[in-house]
Curated annotation (Swiss-Prot):
Organism, scientific name: Buchnera aphidicola subsp. Uroleucon rurale
Cofactor: [4Fe-4S] cluster
Gene from which this protein is expressed: leuC
Full protein name: 3-isopropylmalate dehydratase large subunit
Gene Ontology MF, one: 4 iron, 4 sulfur cluster binding
Catalyzed chemical reaction(s): (2R,3S)-3-isopropylmalate = (2S)-2-isopropylmalate
């Protein structure tokens, strides 16, 4: 029944796009994939835009200095009908990331650490501006990872001021401005930054100089621990709510306090999602996997974020590195991030996942992310 409903929904979507002359990257389009990967790589996402989409991780586009956030179905209808959306004023928060980033620490590690510090509701009601020397040095794909995960601390969106790295990324993209319009656009984009004396409702400065790679151990993105540490003792938490949440998470995950994260066995590996399925992510993973093999009892898949990413990876020979290491090389899409199609965990299976959420059942009923 659900398959039939999905087919009808897709057929209606195709019909509506055709009727109203809306570009559709359907499954037959060689560049199809995840919207939060396609829009930036094609230059559809530009600084200063207001972008809404029926998906919470629309905040990804904030990496370009665009105000972007997820909306519900009825709001999507309203936007399509009126090109407007009534919103209450958001509170604003500044998170300054400073320090020298250690080797092997990624943008994903940094944002997970921030979420662990502030909590899964620490950003509720806020649009968060990320800044600081660490953010300035990040590539656009790294910045997208940071803004993508802002939602996991309850924020409405994340945003980063555009700069030369932004302009360089957007130059000569299919939908980017060109010629005289390009120069005028950059002149405008340079104004899209907070004033030096701008007021923020909350400000935080976080030094990542001593940060180690981060791994979530529970059923919420703020239940995060450094890879070289143990699962914390319940008594470490001062709040009864946090203590009970940690106990509940360990029970669901089949883990015990005091266990080193490096001693935990896994059943599956998923490289993909709108958080970490871009070409830089695949390059990083392939560098580690080159001339190595995964264990025989582990099933691993790579799902590029778009057809363009897949094509680029294949041109660079990355697909062969993954395949030789024992991974399946898949077509673009969302896949195991949310247990789509048959890409899901079985009850009790544990997955090391590149995705953004580790909720109970997110990757399959009883699955442990």
């Amino acid at each position: 029944a659900s398959g039939l409903m999905a087919r009808k929904q897709m057929e209606q979507l195709i019909k509506n796009c055709d009727e109203f002359n809306i570009s559709l990257y359907d499954i037959n389009n060689p560049n199809q994939g995840i919207v939060h990967v396609i829009a930036p790589e094609k230059g559809m996402t530009l600084p200063g835009m207001i972008i809404v989409c029926g998906d919470s991780h629309t905040s990804t586009h904030g990496a370009f200095g665009a105000l972007s956030f997820g909306i519900g179905t009825s709001e999507v209808e309203h936007v399509l009908a009126t090109q407007t959306l009534k919103q209450q004023r958001f509170k604003n928060m500044k998170i300054e990331i400073i320090g020298d980033v250690p080797q092997f620490v990624t943008a994903k590690d940094i944002i997970l650490f921030v979420i662990g510090r502030l909590g899964s509701s620490g950003g509720t009601g806020y649009v968060i501006e990320f800044c600081g020397n660490v953010i300035k040095k990040m590539s656009m794909e790294e910045r997208m990872t940071v803004c993508n995960m802002a939602i996991e601390m309850g924020a409405k969106s994340g945003i980063i001021a555009p700069d030369e790295i932004t302009y360089s990324y957007l130059r000569e993209k299919i939908y980017s401005p060109y010629g005289l319009f390009w120069k005028k656009s950059i002149d405008y984009w340079k104004t899209l930054k907070s004033d030096k004396d701008a007021f923020f409702d909350k400000c935080f400065t976080i030094d990542v100089s001593n940060l180690a790679p981060q791994v979530t151990r529970g059923t919420n993105p703020d239940q995060v621990t450094s890879i070289n540490e143990k699962i914390p003792n319940y008594n470490k938490f001062h709040s009864i709510v946090q203590k009970n949440s940690a106990k509940s998470a360990c029970k669901y995950m089949g883990l015990k306090e005091g266990t080193y994260l490096t001693d935990i066995f896994i059943d599956k590996v998923f490289i993909g999602s709108c958080t970490n399925a871009r070409i830089e992510d695949l390059r990083s993973a392939s560098t580690i996997l080159k001339n190595r093999k995964i264990a025989n009892n582990v099933k691993a898949i790579v799902v590029p974020g778009s057809g363009s990413v897949k094509q680029q990876a294949e041109m660079e020979g990355l697909d062969k590195i993954f395949i030789n290491a024992g991974f399946e090389w898949r077509l673009p899409g969302c896949s195991m991030c949310l247990g789509m199609n048959n890409d899901r965990l079985n009850v009790g299976e544990r997955c090391a996942s590149h995705s953004n959420r580790n909720f109970e059942g997110r990757q399959g009923r009883g699955g442990r992310t």
